């Protein structure tokens, strides 16, 4: 999954990331049951705060796009 963020955008970083993940899910680029990257690794890969990715994952879960399982990830 290729996520691109822009610090100069008016759209908050977490929303940019969340929308790109949702698009990947809706387009079938991410399959049902496929694990998302760990929060720490994903944050490092796209150079954003761990808190930003945590918020993205929490919102995706609230919206029904992700399920978090203890010990397995999101």
Locations of the language-model features?
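Extreme N-terminal segment that seeds HTH/winged-HTH DNA-binding domains in transcriptional regulators
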Residues: 1-35, 41
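Residues at secondary-structure transition points
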Residues: 8-12, 16, 51, 63, ...
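Minor-groove-contacting beta-hairpin "wing" of winged helix-turn-helix DNA-binding domains
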Residues: 38, 72-74
């Amino acid at each position: 999954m290729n996520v691109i963020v822009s610090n100069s955008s008016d759209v908050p970083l977490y929303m940019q990331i969340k929308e790109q993940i949702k698009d990947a899910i809706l387009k079938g680029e991410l399959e049902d049951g496929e694990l998302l990257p760990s929060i720490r690794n994903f944050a490092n890969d796209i150079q954003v705060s761990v808190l930003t990715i945590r918020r993205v994952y929490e919102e995706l879960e609230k919206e029904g796009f992700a399920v978090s399982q203890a010990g397995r990830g999101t």
